[in-house]
Amino acid sequence: MFKITRKGFTLIELLVVIAIIAILIGLLLPAVQKVREAAARMKCQNNLKNLGLACHNLEGVRGGLPPSSVQSPSVIDIPGLKEFQKSGTTGTLAAHYAKHCFLSIILPYIEQGNVLKQAGGAYDLTQDWYAAINRSASGTRIPTFECPSTPFGHSFSTSSLSAAEQTTYGAGWTLPTADYMAVNRSNNRAIIWTTMGLTDPGVNSDSIKGVLASNQFTRLLSVTDGLSNTIMLAEASARPQDRRLGKLANPLAGGASPYMNGAWAHSGNDIAIDGSNAAGSTLSAAADVPTACRVNCTNQGEVYSFHSGGANICMGDGSVRFMSESVSLKALLTMAARADGNPPSE
């Protein structure tokens, strides 16, 4: 009688199988990551489209696009900001106007009625965004304001701030963040424009203001460079962290920090697109122009994302584009200004 023996895998065969599986995983993982990032980038673009649409829906009701921010308005701006006047004040001083950013102002136009009711009533634009009546709503995460590609946790605690800031904004309060900012102006240094061979639009003129400007509702006709040629919103991801060239430059905001405006409701949620030098600082001298960094250089006041090769922007007409890191400085600065008069450049 013959005895039948079962032959199993030898150690070498098992190791070969494991090696093949490891190779397959190594080949498939980058593909999976690319698909995941493509989906995140598309979601990010859809968020910007919704925000752009909300701005235009408000324009249809109000007759102007929303202010990028309302804080410390000038005497010239005050007459157009009556809906932000604090109750019980005469409305004659800058301090009589509540502080808000465009994201708070467009809340009713992005179907966020539930957020407006968090404090037991409508979000009150006549009180500062951090006032007690608005704190519950301001402390609520809104997915439309967040890009899924951003690795930062989309919230931070006021406990990380200085004692003075905690006195102003409240202690132990968790603030949700936003990855999208309004572009309120372009570079305001004449030397930068003339070094690039462009006409200086005037450092204090309306020409360098963005589609959404500080302390004023923008009439569409004032965007003389064309809505489709001018940036309205852009990614400036991961604030309040200080990110430079893909790396964390400083830890979470603390002390007397300018990065508090990572909170989505913060009245400083607008950026001036200036371009930056290699250190991540604003361009201020002619020598900075040849080596200027344009996109994904720093998230402190510039266009910044965690997408490979560029960042998403929303134009004045509501269309969304992917701006490459290789965009020229000329194109970037002229696209940030609504009426500089210089022809579009690529």
What are these regions (language model features)?
Residues 4-44, 50:
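N-terminal single-pass transmembrane signal-anchor helix
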Residues 40-346:
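Surface-exposed loop/linker segments characteristic of extracytoplasmic
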